[in-house]
């Protein structure tokens, strides 16, 4: 049975999605990297192997694609046949699972993006990689400070009757504003709802500035699990927000569909034994020109298997020694 694997490695979490030749999801995984993306990817392969052994030993991985900010690292570890940016991967998944969608709001752990689609093709996009305000890591920090499990954050927000106003342009000022609102007696649910509304405004005024946000509007990423953020976007846009199945793993799902469509004759997959290998990454600065690129070097069991990060390909084109 031929299957195709998509892997999305981000700043906070990693995702695996395995599909069959009809784009049916057979296995999916969404977990935190916990600051160690190499070990996270290896653990992902351990879980996938266990799933295959327990469900269908005849599953064959016919192709692997990686995406996300850690796509090159994941590609080297897995032996990817295709490495694609997350904009392309998300657009591909949405065109298959939410046909007709025109706007994609995606908020992850430390970045956020907007994708404008026409006939299933990304025609415009913007990303915020500078400030974490409104992203998953910021919401995690606030839920911890308020002693509310992040899973309950959204449920609490939608109970609010009078959301308070929270300044949300900057994560530092937003936190200070929340503390002030607590001190003057605002209810926790009103503060949480106010934070969600402020973050939605911040997103629309930042990442979404100047974009034509037309329905159907799809909300993806870990933050899309937050009911309060869904409600805040619906209030700000006065439009229904669609949160589709597999909303947290759409990047990996799109990568899997892309590699299925590419249909490599022979996969470069290194095999499940990669989960037991000694994998290390290091970097050095190339001083060959004024760019002074930071080159990343990956080793598996002491052998250099890849280099990347150089603009001119001086190092990445070298055969591993």
List where the protein language model places each region.
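Glycine-rich phosphate-binding/hydrolytic loop that grips phosphoryl groups
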Residues: 136-140, 245-272
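Short glycine-rich, Thr/Ser-proximal phosphate-binding strand/loop in the N-terminal lobe
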Residues: 4-46, 124-125, 129-130, 311-312
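Glycine-rich phosphate-binding loops at beta-strand->alpha-helix junctions
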Residues: 69-70, 209-236, 244-251
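Glycine-rich phosphate-binding loop plus the immediately following alpha-helix
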Residues: 34-38, 119-162, 170, 261, ...
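Adenine-nucleotide phosphate-binding core of ATP-dependent small-molecule kinases
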Residues: 174-209
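Short beta-strand-loop/turn "lid" adjacent to the catalytic site in phosphate-handling enzymes
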Residues: 29-33, 52-87, 116, 123-124
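Gly/Thr-rich phosphate-binding beta-strand-loop-beta motif of the actin/hexokinase/Hsp70
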Residues: 1-24, 101-118, 162, 285-299
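Acidic, glycine/GT-rich loop-and beta-edge segments that sit at the periphery of enzyme/chaperone cores
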Residues: 113, 261-321
């Amino acid at each position: 049975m031929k299957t195709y694997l998509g892997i999305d490695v981000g700043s906070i979490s990693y995702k695996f999605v395995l599909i069959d030749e009809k784009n049916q999801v057979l296995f999916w995984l969404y977990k935190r990297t916990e600051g160690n993306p190499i070990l996270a990817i290896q653990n992902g392969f351990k879980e996938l192997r266990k799933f295959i052994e327990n469900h269908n030993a005849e599953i064959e991985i016919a192709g692997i694609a990686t995406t996300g900010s850690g796509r090159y690292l994941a590609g080297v570890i897995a032996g990817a046949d295709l490495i694609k940016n997350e904009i392309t991967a998300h657009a591909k998944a949405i065109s298959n699972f939410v046909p007709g969608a025109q706007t994609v709001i995606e908020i992850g752990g430390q970045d956020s993006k907007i994708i404008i689609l026409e006939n299933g093709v990304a025609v415009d996009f913007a990303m915020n990689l500078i400030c974490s305000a409104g992203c998953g890591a910021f919401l995690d920090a606030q839920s911890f400070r308020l002693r509310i499990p992040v899973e309950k954050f959204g449920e609490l927000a939608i109970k609010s009757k009078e959301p308070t106003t929270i300044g949300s342009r900057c994560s530092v000022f937003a936190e200070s504003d929340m503390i002030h609102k607590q001190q003057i007696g605002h209810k926790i649910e009103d503060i949480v709802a106010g934070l969600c509304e402020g973050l939605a405004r911040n997103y629309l005024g930042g990442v979404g500035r100047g974009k034509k946000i037309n329905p159907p509007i799809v909300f993806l990423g870990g933050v899309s699990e937050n009911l309060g953020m869904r409600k805040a976007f619906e209030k700000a846009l006065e439009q229904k927000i669609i949160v589709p199945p597999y909303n947290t793993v759409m990047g990996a799902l799109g990568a899997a569909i892309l590699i299925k469509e590419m249909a490599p004759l022979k996969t470069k997959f290194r095999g499940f034994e990669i989960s037991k290998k000694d994998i290390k990454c290091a970097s050095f600065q190339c001083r060959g020109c004024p760019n002074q690129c930071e080159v990343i070097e990956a080793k598996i069991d002491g052998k250099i298997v890849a280099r990347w990060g150089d603009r001119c390909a001086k190092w990445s084109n070298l055969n591993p020694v």
